[in-house]
Amino acid sequence: MAMANDYGNPERGPSFEETNFRSALEGMGHELVAFDFMERARVAGKTQMRRELVAAAADARADVAFFCLFTDELDAGTIEDVRRRGGAPTVNWFADDHWRFDNFTKNIAPAFDLAVTTDAASLPKYEAAGLGGKVLLSQWACNRYAYTRVSEDIEHDVTFVGQPHGNRQEIIDRITAAGHPVECWGYGWPAGKLDHAGMVRVFSTSRVNLNLSNSSTPPNTLRVRVGRWLGRGPTGPQPPQIKGRNFEVPGCGGFLLTESVPHLDKYFELGKEVAVYESPDDLVEQVGYWLEHDDERAAVADAGYRRVLAEHTYDHRFEAIFRALQLGGDAA
């Protein structure tokens, strides 16, 4: 149960959930019954959408009901009806616990059999809310069925794929002023957004892929703006955190230069599998360094690629979820 389109808008293309979660589960060999709550609510209204969801769950009789809620699409009663009539344990992937645990997750997580979080700092909050027995710490990953090494030929020097939030434009300008022009794609940049295949190619064929934080300002995604409208959004700068990009770029065989964030060293050997920077000055210096050291850069990219395929694909993440539900962990 998730959005098929990015923020529910077909003009923006497939959603993260569609490109990563659904694609990975299908690649693992699982049969899925998809329900786009955003589209059904838009067409039929929220009340009717909830009825249709419960009916779909009853018809599917699936092994697990997996949710990626956006805001307040469902209430606890609907989730409990899905479990009761569908006969399957319910799971929600909580993507934003770093900023909306207290005014979102804490209220809806009790309705699920399992809450999956990517935020280690929220685990004490789950415990305090009496949810310690139903939370699983997971992490973003790479969907190996959608992100692959497509070429070993270099086509770009320094690239960034993402939106110009916070001080990103300023940082890009500083790198460019140091003699290293940065090619940028995404909503808000002149070049616009890449399609998925184009993005994968950029990751695979860039000397240096940048992963920039927007922690200098509050996040401003549509999910955040809707959350603010509902009284659930962050009001101040948020700490940097691990993102999907930390796994997607290495998963394409690309070299990643990313901001140092808490817990990243639990997933990679820093400096050996991905490169990290500590400040804008350090970033500018490292861009120059890595552009000049081809063999060392290639070794880091290859090590990161092997680490992702060995430990950090969505196959690994979903297998852990299935084990937590006592459904077994085989990917077949």
Predicted regions and their residues:
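Nucleotide-sugar donor-binding catalytic core of glycosyltransferases
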Residues: M1-E52, D59-R61, F67-G77, P110-L270, ...
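Alpha-helical elements of Rossmann-like donor-binding domains used by nucleotide-donor carbohydrate transfer enzymes
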Residues: N20, Q48, E52, D282-Y289, ...
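A charged, aromatic-enriched C-terminal amphipathic alpha-helix characteristic of glycosyltransferases
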Residues: M28, E292-R323
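Short hydrophobic patches on amphipathic alpha-helices
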Residues: A57-A58, V82, F203, V287
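Catalytic-core regions built around general acid/base machinery
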Residues: T78-G86, N107-I108
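Active-site proximal beta-strand in glycosyltransferases
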Residues: V82-D97
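Conserved acidic donor-binding segment of nucleotide-sugar-dependent glycosyltransferases
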Residues: V274-P280, Y289-D294
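Generic C-terminal helix-cap and adjacent flexible tail
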Residues: L325-A332
